[in-house]
Amino acid sequence: MINFTDINEVRNILNEYDFNFSKSLGQNFLIDSTVCPRMAEICGASDECGVIEIGTGIGTLTSELAKKGGKVVTMEVDKKLYPIIDKTLADFDNIKVLHQDAMKSDLKKIIVEEFESKDVAVCANLPYYITSPILMFLLESGIQWRNITVMIQKEVADRICAEPGKKNTGAITYAIRYYG
């Protein structure tokens, strides 16, 4: 099993598959040894709560979610990552990888097919450029999420937490308050 917090191991696997980061996808991979376990804990991943992860990356967060015991359905749009994911997550039998864009997914169908009647949470490390669209997609889905746990850039967090009517408010400010 890969040590996701060892930069040299991560580099080696990326080099093995001749992977280059895509600026257009806003890719960055978590390697901090404390962030992913904490996110998995906060989102409530467990036998009683399944998780939909948006953006598998190389599987760092995915593996931490899976270690909590429940089913993880993870979606990745970058085809160049598929063989890497197959290798890095091969030891887990509670992960299903969907090769698709989360924004084009039928989340209700995925939940019915994969989680039956369990609670479902969302967990993701979101690129800046797609944070608001993804959050809006999740909020407007009509699904009763157990929770939505995301890592986002400070600028987006500031906009989400802004007081209505202030300079840095945006549609996401009001949407979070409405759906809250």
Predicted regions and their residues:
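Catalytic cores of RNA-modifying enzymes
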Residues: 1-180
